[in-house]
């Protein structure tokens, strides 16, 4: 009897994980359909925000002063603030 309860519990957990995975897949598909242009537009909008611009400038100055790791950090600056 105890083994049956464990089996039922395992089946319930498996079903719940499948439902969560299906929901994530739907969200991912919606983002793909939204397209890269929408992502670029939203990033530009974030960059136009004054606070974000300040973060970009601070990050860029940090990258310039970073010494040996500067090349890698500057690449991150371009990724983070390239559209600012």
Curated annotation (Swiss-Prot):
Keyword entries, A-Z: Antibiotic, Antimicrobial, Cleavage on pair of basic residues, Disulfide bond, Membrane, Secreted, Signal, Target cell membrane, Target membrane
Localization annotation: Secreted; Target cell membrane
Propeptide positions: 23-44
Signal peptide per UniProt: 1-22
Record's keyword annotation contains Repeat: no
Similarity comment text for this entry: Belongs to the sea anemone type 1 potassium channel toxin family.
Protein name: Antimicrobial peptide aurelin
Originating species: Aurelia aurita
